[in-house]
Amino acid sequence: MDILVVGGGGREHAIVMKLAESPKVGKLYCTPGNGGISRYAECFDVAATDIEGVVALAKKLKVDMVAV
């Protein structure tokens, strides 16, 4: 399952870290992310408040789930 996590704070970092441990998770993406998150997920420069941008990114990446 490919997942996009939206946000770049400590909560999102913890979510990404735990998701990265799961064998059920394929590709892991985050927007906007941060330096720590980028160790576990590919990060993109789309603001969490840019709803249209996040939707477009999710469609482009063809993710199975978005965690906000």
What is the predicted function of each stretch?
Residues 1-68:
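ATP-binding N-terminal substructure of ATP-dependent carboxylate-amine bond-forming enzymes
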